[in-house]
Amino acid sequence: MNQLDALREMTVVVADTGDIEAIRQYQPQDATTNPSLILSASALSQYAPLIDDAIRYAKSKSGNKAQQLVDAEDKLAVNIGLEILKIVPGRISTEVDARFSYDTEKTIAKARKLIGLYNEAGVANNRILIKIAATWQGIRAAEILEKEGINCNLTLLFSQAQARACAEAGVYLISPFVGRILDWYKANEKKEYAAAEDPGVISVTAIYNYYKQYNYKTIVMGASFRNVGEITEIAGCDRLTIAPPLLKALAESNETLVRKLDYQGEILDRPAPLSEAEFYWQHNQDPMAVDKLAEGIRKFAIDQEKLEEMLSAKL
């Protein structure tokens, strides 16, 4: 049995891509997209009809150019999601504009709009996850959305404080990042790490065990991998979202895969939820998490703006 098939027996495998052909090839349960993946997918020729449809939709909705641009980017993200949902049996994650990461109300409004576009296309809420950056404001937005039956995927998660606050808010799923944590430590500590000592692996392992220890139902979906070793070291995690090159590497490897995450300890009483002040104090004790959350939001916002430039030229 290859490692990808072995992994599927202990973990739900998700494709981290907007590339429909790659998704078709590796047959994941779910798929995740983000502004950067939507931007790169939009450059593929087979996506031209989806872009054209988004432009037509936007023009039919408003005569205002600025509003057309907003409507076109939302519709394009949903169009790509709809194509992916024809292939995956589970859920698609579609991301809220990263520029709303510190605005609870705008995040909620955008999430409702994206869900509405999916619903208009005949897709029920139980096939969609709304991706939101795991800022305090984003977590509060997710708490409200979850109560409305809109499940959320809290992303750009780098600290234990972020993970704890998400669980306490009743968030459906979190995406703790592995590879970007490794990137920070390699750049700042100037050293290499074996897979078992990888700071990203250690972080996700701690989050997974914390959730199981306190019986939180929030799903842990490891994300952002730099190598196969990071994946195999957290085999057994609830879900893992993996880019096509690493799905390929797993499918081509027949090395034995051992389950690494499998909490068997006692279940403890949950602590009182973090206050906003406690959240910021704990999150800001971790310079890596502070750097990578801010950088991740900036990068997604830059790619959102590049996508807008591409769409604006067509409006």
Curated annotation (Swiss-Prot):
It catalyses: D-sedoheptulose 7-phosphate + D-glyceraldehyde 3-phosphate = D-erythrose 4-phosphate + beta-D-fructose 6-phosphate. The keyword Transferase applies. Its main location: cytoplasm. Coiled coil: none annotated. One of its GO terms (cellular component) is cytosol. Its EC number is 2.2.1.2. The keyword Lipid metabolism does not apply. One of its GO terms (biological process) is carbohydrate metabolic process. It is found in: Cytoplasm. It comes from the Bacteria. One of its GO terms (molecular function) is transaldolase activity. Keywords: Cytoplasm, Pentose shunt, Schiff base, Transferase. InterPro entries: Aldolase_TIM (IPR013785), TAL/FSA (IPR001585), Transaldolase_1 (IPR004730), Transaldolase_AS (IPR018225). Pathway: Carbohydrate degradation; pentose phosphate pathway; D-glyceraldehyde 3-phosphate and beta-D-fructose 6-phosphate from D-ribose 5-phosphate and D-xylulose 5-phosphate (non-oxidative stage): step 2/3. The active site is at 131 (schiff-base intermediate with substrate). NCBIfam families: PRK12346.1, talAB. Transaldolase is important for the balance of metabolites in the pentose-phosphate pathway. Belongs to the transaldolase family. Type 1 subfamily. Homodimer. This is Transaldolase. It comes from Haemophilus ducreyi (strain 35000HP / ATCC 700724).
